[in-house]
């Protein structure tokens, strides 16, 4: 069986050159990117990684990829990350893995952003996948009520154990469900006005190249 995630994840490594500072995303597709980069580092490639989550940091360290924090780099040459959905206008939803805040900060500091996906992630309109919003624990219920008044349904993210999911930043995640985000700019503005929302998973002006693996194993490169 063809592993689309592995194909897309490894393909993106072709953009990585010696001496680069590389943003390392989080998720099941970019996992393969990081594995491949670890192999390349062990074969002599010199890069510095900036991890977007504790999970990614642990994986990179285990593979021998040198890391620095975002505070310690002036800019990032390329960030490779996954996405939950991408529409035809290069707008995306990210954060299914809970790392949306750090992912967006790293993406903002990057000269180029590459997203690695399998073809089912390409959609006409955003919204089939829930939109995560990271909120501070204090008063999170009030944020939920505020959105309910706007007829926006949210679900507090929990772990499989039933405990509340807590991000690497100590925050909670509310997932907006049953909603289509045709006017993503409007949604971005709406969410930015609600106190207590730290960040949302709409990534509207970030991606430069999409590496999409198809079911037959072929790669499609979609450039902005």
Curated annotation (Swiss-Prot):
UniProt-annotated catalytic positions: 103 (proton acceptor)
Its EC number(s): 5.3.1.6
Protein's GO biological process: pentose-phosphate shunt, non-oxidative branch
Keyword Isomerase: yes
Keywords: Isomerase
Gene3D superfamilies xref list: 3.30.70.260, 3.40.50.1360
Pathway: Carbohydrate degradation; pentose phosphate pathway; D-ribose 5-phosphate from D-ribulose 5-phosphate (non-oxidative stage): step 1/1
Entry annotated with the keyword Isomerase: yes
InterPro entries, alphabetized: NagB/RpiA_transferase-like, Ribose-5P_isomerase, Ribose5P_isomerase_typA_subgr, Ribose5P_isomerase_type_A
Stored Pfam families: Rib_5-P_isom_A (PF06026)
Catalytic reaction(s) noted: aldehydo-D-ribose 5-phosphate = D-ribulose 5-phosphate
Binding site for substrate: 26-29, 81-84, 94-97, 121
GO terms assigned for molecular function: ribose-5-phosphate isomerase activity
Transmembrane segments: none
Classification via CDD domains: RPI_A
PANTHER family listed in its UniProt record: RIBOSE-5-PHOSPHATE ISOMERASE 3, CHLOROPLASTIC-RELATED
Entry's family note: Belongs to the ribose 5-phosphate isomerase family.
Function: Catalyzes the reversible conversion of ribose-5-phosphate to ribulose 5-phosphate.
Record-linked NCBIfam families: PRK00702.1, rpiA
Subunit structure: Homodimer.
Protein name, entry field: Ribose-5-phosphate isomerase A
Organism of this sequence: Listeria monocytogenes serotype 4b (strain CLIP80459)
């Amino acid at each position: 069986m063809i592993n689309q995630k592995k194909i897309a994840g490894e393909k993106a490594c072709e953009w990585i050159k010696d001496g680069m500072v590389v943003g390392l995303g989080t998720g099941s597709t970019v996992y393969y990117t990081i594995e491949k980069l670890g192999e390349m580092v062990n074969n002599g490639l010199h890069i510095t990684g900036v991890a977007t989550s504790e999970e990614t940091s642990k994986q990179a360290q285990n593979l021998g990829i040198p890391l620095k924090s975002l505070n310690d780099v002036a800019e990032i040459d390329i960030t490779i990350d996954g996405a939950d959905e991408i529409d035809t206008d290069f707008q995306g939803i990210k954060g299914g893995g809970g790392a949306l805040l750090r992912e967006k900060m790293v993406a903002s500091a990057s000269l180029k952003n590459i997203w690695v996906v399998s073809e089912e992630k390409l959609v006409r309109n955003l919204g089939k996948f829930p939109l995560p919003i990271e909120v501070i624990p204090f008063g999170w219920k009030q944020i939920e009520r505020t959105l309910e008044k706007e007829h926006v349904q949210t679900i507090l993210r929990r772990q499989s154990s039933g405990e509340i999911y807590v991000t690497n930043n100590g925050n909670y995640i509310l997932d907006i469900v049953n909603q289509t985000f045709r006017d993503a700019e409007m949604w971005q503005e709406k969410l930015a006005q609600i106190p207590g929302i730290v960040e949302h998973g709409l990534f509207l002006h970030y991606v430069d190249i999409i590496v999409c693996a198809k079911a037959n194993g072929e790669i499609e490169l979609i450039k902005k």
